[in-house]
Design a protein with these regions (language model features):
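Helix-to-loop junction immediately C-terminal to a conserved catalytic motif
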Residues: 52
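Conserved ABC transporter NBD signature motif
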Residues: 60-70, 80
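Conserved catalytic motifs of ABC-family nucleotide-binding domains
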Residues: 90-100
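Conserved ABC ATPase "signature" region
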Residues: 115-132
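Conserved ABC ATPase signature
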Residues: 136-142
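Hydrophobic anchor residue at the start of the ABC signature
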Residues: 150
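Catalytic Walker B motif of ABC-type/P-loop ATPase nucleotide-binding domains
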Residues: 161-165
């Protein structure tokens, strides 16, 4: 099986000398679903940002789809980022309808109008939002807002999907529904890495889980 992410000897230290990530080694196969679980301020969001090319590694190597993130030019890094779907923690949609949010994202990525319309409908169907496409995003429930964030992240057929705290603000049943949706999006070809404080819903049992503790990754 092809490798989507290969991290070797990754270190990251803040400007005031705090070691956040220390000697991280991580391998994610193409088409795999991985949960990274760790407490607040453990470096989960930072690790996702590094994997997504939002900033270069200070030390160590990150390969994404065979490309060395640390050696990419700013232009090439931007190209890579545009091929990665990302749902940030505390995602806030635009003050538009659900459909308009997705359409705006697709148009901003260079899709022509007709192509953007087709992709938007597919993304809304995949995330269970087609019935709410005309609803203002501000009126969505917490779970449906996560659905919209995922629709935005996958609408342009990314190589990789990175999700930061998808269960934040959800009750136990909603966490289970969000987890099942992530699993459905991953099924087939999409590689997914999701970071969360946990605990994971019961429906996540059987998925690969690593824990980020004291700056180090440990397989569960």
């Amino acid at each position: 099986m092809a490798v989507m992410i290969q991290v070797s000897e990754l270190h990251f230290t803040t400007e005031d000398g705090v070691k956040v990530l220390e000697d991280i080694h991580l391998r994610v196969e193409q088409g795999e679903l991985l949960y990274i679980v760790g407490p607040a301020s453990s470096g989960k969001s930072l690790l996702l940002g590094l994997l997504g090319g939002q900033l270069p590694p200070q030390r160590g190597q990150i390969l994404v789809h065979g490309r060395n993130v640390g050696r990419l030019s700013p232009e090439r890094r931007l190209e890579l980022r545009q091929r990665i779907g990302y749902l940030p923690q505390g995602f806030a949609p635009l003050s538009r309808t659900v459909h308009e949010n997705v359409l705006f994202k697709l148009r901003s990525l260079g899709n022509f109008r007709e192509q953007a319309e087709e992709k938007a409908i597919l993304a809304l169907e995949a995330t269970g939002l087609i019935r709410l496409q005309g609803v203002e995003a501000a009126e969505l429930s917490s779970l449906d807002r996560i659905r919209l964030g995922l629709a935005l992240a996958v609408c342009d057929d990314p190589l990789l999907l990175l999700i930061d705290e998808p269960f934040e603000g959800l009750d136990a049943n909603e966490c289970g529904e969000a987890c099942l949706l992530i699993d459905r999006l991953h099924t087939g070809h999409l590689t997914v890495v999701a970071a969360t404080r946990g605990p994971l819903p019961d429906v996540a049992r059987g998925q690969r889980i690593v824990r980020l503790v004291d700056g180090a990754v440990m397989e569960s």
